[in-house]
Swiss-Prot record:
Gene behind this protein: RELL1
Name used for this protein in its record: RELT-like protein 1
GO BP terms in the entry: positive regulation of p38MAPK cascade
Organism name: Gallus gallus (Chicken)
CC annotations in GO: plasma membrane
Keywords in alphabetical order: Cell membrane, Glycoprotein, Membrane, Signal, Transmembrane, Transmembrane helix
Region (Disordered): 145-172, 237-288
Residue ranges annotated as Extracellular topological domain: 24-57
Residue ranges that the UniProt entry lists as topological domain Cytoplasmic: 79-288
Biased composition (Low complexity): 152-172
Primary localization: membrane
Transmembrane segments: 58-78
Length: 288
């Protein structure tokens, strides 16, 4: 049994028990809250980092079907327009450019830089007109002072050669070749053979003439829509052209038929007065 409390003095022991427990619990809660507050930014950061890739994956899963459906929708629209007489193309606009032979030679020379070095040097020298004139004069002088050279016209028994382009007296014979390049034809040769054409490694480069002839050939083609490289053009059906041709032929026949009946009428008008005259002469002869 506890001793009785003194009069006038309140009992402190029972009151201190709950307060001490409450204070102890409060300190524990404060420590837990502090730890939780310290851990909050880390937890939020990890949660944010974990959610971002998930959102990106969802966006990718959404965008891929959207683009796929848009492509199928475009193909469907093109097929519908084609049935209605339109034509959808994705060809880029081709500009017609007149290529000069010099540009063709340069293109082929760049494609085959190591094919013939001497030919390239001659090409660069002959581009200048002054150098070409001097070279022609030098060739003419050498042909005059060397009577035994095959290029001199007075040399007896000189073999017939096609003539190099540098000789002034030679006839202007063009060397026909599919490859556009500088030809090294000249000297004593039996046939008009180019040294560069004889190489098997020489690939014939055909200049690509991209023009709009295929577009112009189609009559009645009108561009309805043009967005970048995508074009929608209206093309007339062949039946319409055939109907127009048939109408033109019918109108031509009607014009001819309109002129034809005019001639029999004139002939009847000419023959009508002639018949009574003949009958009258026959009656007179019979009466006589």
């Amino acid at each position: 049994m506890a001793p009785p409390a003194a009069s006038g003095i309140p009992s402190i022991a029972p009151s201190l028990g709950p307060t001490a427990v409450w204070l102890g619990n409060r300190s524990d809660l404060g420590d837990v809250q502090a730890l939780a507050s310290r851990d909050l930014p880390t937890t939020t950061v990890t949660a944010g980092n974990n959610n971002k890739p998930e959102h990106l994956e969802y966006v990718a899963f959404v965008l891929v079907p959207v683009f796929f459906i848009m492509g199928l929708l475009g193909i469907l629209i093109c097929h519908v327009l084609k049935k209605k007489g339109y034509r959808c193309t994705t060809e880029a606009e081709e500009v017609e450019e007149e290529e000069k032979p010099d540009e063709k030679i340069e293109m082929n020379e760049t494609a085959h830089e190591n094919s013939d070095t001497v030919g390239q040097i001659i090409n660069y020298i002959m581009k200048n007109e002054a150098n070409a004139d001097v070279l022609k004069a030098m060739v003419a002088d050498s042909s005059v002072f060397e009577p035994e050279s095959p290029m001199s016209p007075n040399a007896p028994g000189s073999p017939t050669s096609p003539g190099s382009p540098l000789s002034p007296g030679a006839a202007s014979l063009k060397h026909n070749c599919k490859g556009h390049h500088l030809h090294t034809v000249g000297g004593v040769i039996e046939k008009d053979v180019c040294s560069r054409c004889s190489h098997k490694r020489w690939h014939h480069i055909k200049p690509a003439h991209k023009s709009k002839e295929h577009r112009r050939s189609r009559l009645g083609e009108v561009t309805v829509l043009s967005v970048g490289r995508f074009r929608v053009t209206k093309v007339e059906h062949k039946s319409n052209s055939k109907e127009r041709k048939s109408l033109m032929s019918v109108t031509g026949v009607e014009g001819l038929n309109g002129d034809m009946p005019a001639t029999p009428v004139k002939q009847e008008a000419k023959e009508a007065p002639a018949t009574p005259v003949k009958e009258g002469t026959q009656e007179r002869r019979s009466s006589e």
